[in-house]
Curated annotation (Swiss-Prot):
Classification via PROSITE patterns: RIBOSOMAL_S3AE
Upper lineage: Eukaryota, Viridiplantae, Streptophyta, Embryophyta, Tracheophyta
Key words of the record: Cytoplasm, Ribonucleoprotein, Ribosomal protein
Protein name (Swiss-Prot/TrEMBL): Small ribosomal subunit protein eS1
Protein source organism: Oryza sativa subsp. japonica (Rice)
Annotated spans, Disordered: 1-20
Amino acid sequence: MAVGKNKRISKGKKGSKKKTVDPFAKKDWYDIKAPSVFNVRNIGKTLVSRTQGTKIASEGLKHRVFEVSLADLQNDEDQAYRKIRLRAEDVQGKNVLTNFWGMSFTTDKLRSLVKKWQTLIEAHVDVKTTDGYMLRLFCIGFTKRRPNQVKRTCYAQASQIRQIRRKMVEIMANQASSCDLKELVSKFIPEVIGKEIEKATSSIFPLQNVFVRKVKILKAPKFDLGKLMEVHGDYAKEDIGTKLDRPAEDEAMAGQEVAAAE
């Protein structure tokens, strides 16, 4: 039997001398700012690795997409079924300025709308806003029973469905093409388009639960900082401090210090 070192005993554990590095030590937190169309402007924070060499932190943040519930943006629990997508467009200091990048409904809300004895009608249209955004709007609506109707069901005929769908497309196209993205988003929140469709189609067949259920941005115009600042409106004013009057005691102390120095 050969006498010598037992390599297995003398060797320590592999990788035991490795230092544990905190992954957050090389990262920074940035505040996410929502457009001025929403009530709550500061919606949260996001992480990004610090600037190292050619890797710039602000470039890593741009075009990140955040999904936020409209209930949090408006401080209104009744709007919890809408999900708003916001895309990071620019970084100013520790603030990430975002813009609208789409909207959708929660699955449970959509499932709760579908019921028996009624007809579901859907429509979609591609439309361009005045500021150059190409959007695809999806609309959903349901038939309802006429006043004093005895019959349980309220199914619409195929010809009526076609007429209603035509009206949906027409109203969505008119509403979206006549305004910019900021104005259009302000129409989605109180469901202006859905109410107009209900009113316009009442002569064909009465509708209920008419919503623009989804908005997709297909194409965005070239980035313009001026337009982004317009969308954020009073963002610049928020960071400006207000002038405070100096207390009389502090003024007296300051006078004594000046006298002592002389």
